[in-house]
Amino acid sequence: MKKICFGAGCLALGLSIAHADETAQWQRAIDAAAARGGGRVTIPAGRHLVGQLDLRSNVEIHLAEGAVLEGLPGLEHYRVVELPFSEGTWSAILFGLNVTNVAVTGTGEIFGNGTAWKIPEDYGGNQEGQRARGLFFADAKGIRLEGFTLRDAACWGIVFKRCADVTARRVTIDSHGNGNNDGFDIEAKDVQIEDCIVDAGDDCYCVKSNDPGFTVENVAVRRCVARSHSNGFKIGTATHGTVRNVRFESCRAEAPTRDFLDNRPSSPNFGRMHFYRPELAHLKVGGGLGAVSIENVDGGRVEGVRVDGLDVAGFMVPIFVRAGTRTGRACGTPPGSQYVFRDIEIANVRGVSESGYASSISGVTGCRVRDVRLRNVDVVCRGAGRARSEVAATRAVPDVSGKYPECNMFGGLLPAFGLWADKVDGLTLENVSFRLREGGEDVRPAVVLTPDVQVLPPWKDLAIRVTSTRDGSAQPGYLYVPPAAKDRKVPLLVALHSWSFGCEFTRSPGAFGLLESAKRGWAFYYPHFRGPNSRPEACGSDLAVQDIVDGIAYAKARANIDPDRIYLLGGSGGGHMALLMAGRHPEIWAGVVAGCPISDVGRWHAETSAMTNGNARYARMLEAVCGGAPRERPDEYRHRSPVTWLAAAKGVPIQIQTGIHDGHHGNSVPVGHAVRAFNCLAAAADRVSDATIAFMERTETVPSAERFVGTDPFYPAPVREIRLRRQSGNAQLTVFNAGHASNYEAGLWWLARQRRGAPVDWTLPTERDKADAGEIQELTR
């Protein structure tokens, strides 16, 4: 008798035939546990043959020491599922669809029996849907995987599609049993993968996006090992939607321990699909392609990627970053999509490049890479030898924009042995070394940056300290002065950090402001103004206001700043401060852009106090700033609110932007804040009524009579379609299809047309004006 234990009870299950198909019995046990409200189903030691087992909410599958859950070969043992949001068919040994609070734990093993599954003769038509995955989750939430081993899956190993709240710890995947042997395939949000080992024939940790309607975000892979014949830590290849805030931290990339396939004579796949790469012949069983591969080739949105701490050996190159158009369509053209590829930082990487190929960072015409930072990178390169490197040194790199992205996609070696970059806007190299191994031979330079690469200085080289004229303290910030400032007056862009950060948070809008200022030959100032809005000296205080004024004076003293072209830009907390500065110091600004701003901190205290999803913390921050709630300290709240001061800013050109969905779905600043700020600046006849504001905040729509009619290429429909636009005097309000968002690209284009003292320029942009689509910032407060 075998015992299946769950909850406080235990269910006895009898099996009369050793090693028979146990699928039905185990499925009954899982269903029984679910019917009792959930609990644990324990798979005891021994071999258990199963087809597909459907997981249930609140049920944990526990693999005891010595337990082997072995997948039966052949699709007839699996319930093949088609999903409306994903092409192809899906099956798995453990299948979790629309489940919540599920777990797979223990020290036992799931054996995919991959070598027993037949694959088509033509690898190009590998028919992934005809082979079962190891574990598959879709539209699931609250997934916990811990301790077990997955061996030789027939296809991908562990798959998350449109999932949320995922944790995997101390999981081992050893999978070389068939084609497409990925380790983790991640299309999910709020994911933590820690202390795992993947030894696989295909990509090990693969973050991707197939569904444009689902945002893949907040993914962290920490202290993990990747051993691969393909890519170690990857974003892509599928990038149809949004992927953002992905971190690979303190990881290792190593050579795999087995051939591309098991390749035993007893295997039905013997001799097939064994990829032999001459470049890696010196490794025992070959090696991988890119240790880190970050790709955007389907016209989607990839941003906020961090690699911090990576030891590399056994891969052709350590770093591969690629924008492309593998489907042959222009970037951002699929319905509802908007191409963005930016904000990538790769830091503290050391190791070996095992081939003559170079690491690369490259885009294509119309699809460029923006804001890439390499810091503390030390790579020893194998080199290609004299003869091959002499040819490669003068070789023209072909256009391979539609080709499948891999580090060796360029039809031959690149003109550098260490790093090659092309079509990059904003590349920063800080303490970066690519050097030949001892005895290595290669005539190519270590690093080649084509003329189509914009190089930026490291942030540390821009750091300044500005002495406050109010309290004498030294306030941090960053100042960029372009070379052109030696010969002529240049504009100054001042960008303001968001609510919960200081100037150390250089992602948004700091990185955007620096990059765009450098492109235009402008000066750029990024002040701290007393840091996060959680202390009395921050959050619109007199000290914070004066810090910005002092910083501008500091810039003027060190650069030839045009006083009629000083611009201000900020979003969220930065939008709050931008409006406050417009009202308190209107004499400075040629133009101000405020995205998703907080305009009345007293009102916002009441709103966030009633919010969930953690937004109530903003009310607590305001109480810490003001010394109590609004009823206790009304003067403090009024003093720090832009609506108190904006009447003085009617002579300043001001553009206010916000998303119609802000204040909903976890977003924290209701749309009424932007609208009421506009009303402070507008003539009475142009103001938005209180009834319309209430309707917008309640329904996330605009009354039909108020809807914007027209087009603006900076707000493409439907993904960023304008819902309402009002202009009055020097002020413009744009409410568009977004959450807590600012459109800095639109704002900066408009700012560049403004001059202090001149009439405001409301010229509508054209498609030609919009050179780079989609610098819309989804903000972190």
Give the label of every model feature segment.
Residues 18-455:
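Extracellular/periplasmic carbohydrate-active domains that bind, remodel
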Residues 456-486:
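N-terminal cap/lid segment of alpha/beta-hydrolase-fold proteins
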Residues 486-490, 495-537, 601-602, 664-666:
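Short substrate-entry loop that stabilizes the transition state in hydrolases
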Residues 500, 504-509, 590-591, 597-598, ...:
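Mobile cap/lid helix-loop segments that gate and shape the active-site cleft of serine hydrolases
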Residues 501, 556-558, 564-613:
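Primarily recognizes the serine-hydrolase "nucleophile elbow" in alpha/beta-hydrolase
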Residues 539-559:
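Alpha/beta-hydrolase active-site loop
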Residues 626-628, 660-728:
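Active-site-adjacent alpha-helix of alpha/beta-hydrolase-fold enzymes
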Residues 656-658:
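Short beta-strand/loop motif that positions the catalytic acidic residue
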